[in-house]
Design a protein with these regions (language model features):
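Conserved phosphate- and dinucleotide-binding cores of soluble alpha/beta proteins
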Residues: 2-26, 76-248
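A phosphate-binding glycine/aspartate-rich beta-alpha loop in the early core of alpha/beta enzymes
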Residues: 50-90
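N-terminal low-complexity or amphipathic/hydrophobic leaders
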Residues: 28-64
Length: 249
């Protein structure tokens, strides 16, 4: 059986976050190792769901849990950047540091999550835009992943899909003659709404169409296939997500 569902960008972010909490590697890292969630719009949802999964009722405003932001011209931020990244150390949550001060103490078995700005679905590749002249948070993240085998997970929404391999786009963006932000390929495990649907329901989804208006800008249509029971689970999940308000920062 196949059903078609629509997800707004905010619904997709919430879905990704919930899917990650159902992932055995993520759960293992949170409870028995270290999980570092680097600030970003999607990772704000991940941090919320992580607190909920741990039964941690502390106040957390995901609006300020961010780094660089792509926003419409003239848009006003509602909250100041919080200035921290969230570390979950053997089930205990810390908000007293950032990736630069925390990641050097992480090693094999630990996990770091870093969002992305570009997604090439055919090869499961992601890239992140770089505004800082020293490379920003991505440099210590990749160093930990490659140098110490810290697992790197890249939560990224389907609205960020691109039409060429990430290395090719990075070559264009990083050329000496280019202007604007640079791009860095991310070597970790890419995690999208498609992965979340599979994790939460067992159904398989493919991207069918995209785009909308009146709050559905950037939305995606997915064709989801599975058993009757799985599709019932998908419909129930989408109904639950449908009340998700638009993302605020």
């Amino acid at each position: 059986m196949t059903c078609e569902i629509m997800l707004t960008v905010a619904m997709g972010k919430r879905l990704i976050a919930r899917g990650l909490m159902a992932d055995t590697q993520v759960a293992d890292a949170m409870r028995y190792h270290k999980l570092l969630i680097i600030g970003g719009s999607t990772n704000g949802y991940v941090a919320e769901e992580a607190l909920r999964a741990l039964g941690d009722g502390r106040a957390f405003d995901k609006r300020g849990f961010r780094r660089g932001v792509t926003a419409a011209p003239g848009a006003q931020m509602q909250a100041k950047p919080c200035g921290f990244d969230m570390l979950i150390d053997h089930g205990c949550v810390r908000t007293d540091g950032d990736v630069f001060s925390l990641i050097n103490d992480m090693g094999q078995g630990d996990m770091v999550m870093k969002g992305a700005n570009a997604l090439y679905l055919p090869d499961g590749e992601a890239g992140v835009l770089i505004g800082h002249p020293q490379g920003g948070t991505v440099i210590p993240t990749i160093a930990a992943h490659i140098g110490r085998r810290v697992n790197l997970v890249v939560p990224v929404g389907l609205e960020k899909r691109v039409e060429a391999p990430i290395m090719r786009l990075a070559a264009i963006s990083n050329a000496a003659c280019a202007d604007g932000p640079r791009m860095c390929p991310l070597p970790g495990r890419v995690y999208t709404e498609l992965d979340a649907i599979a994790a939460l329901t067992g159904a398989q989804a493919v991207l069918l169409a995209a785009g909308g208006a009146l709050g559905a800008e950037g939305c995606v249509w997915l064709a989801v296939s599975g058993t009757d029971e799985q599709i019932a689970g998908v419909r129930a999940l989408v109904k639950e997500l449908s009340g998700e308000p638009a993302t605020e920062l």
